[in-house]
Amino acid sequence: MQRTYTVTIPSFEPALTVFMLVKTSPEWLGFPVERRFALLEEQFTPILRKHAAHVTLRFFDVEFYATRVTDLWMWDARDHHSYQLLVEDLRETAFWDRYFEIVEILPGVENAYARNYGRPAINA
């Protein structure tokens, strides 16, 4: 069964972007691919839907280029509280430090330096 997933573009101006560096666990890799997608659909997707008005996620696979982490989860949040509520829900699942080790969390604000000085953002 082929599933289709789409990238959600935030319908809001993110106040916060968080880069979550994660590493798959041997338990996760031990599941057949279909089971992994079923677990995502059962446990992860409902949380994404619950918070969709305030938080969006983009997945990046980095295992081809890095050894410390296998994936990067990029969260855009409308505000800090929305991100905190999302994390509280994720922590109640096996995806948080069981199926995926949360290696590092890097929060940031896009173009804050330019904004703080009333300058236009430098973009390529």
Curated annotation (Swiss-Prot):
InterPro entries the record matches: Darcynin
The organism of origin for this protein: Granulibacter bethesdensis (strain ATCC BAA-1260 / CGDNIH1)
Pfam family, one: Darcynin
Record-stated family: Belongs to the darcynin family.
Protein name (database record): Darcynin homolog
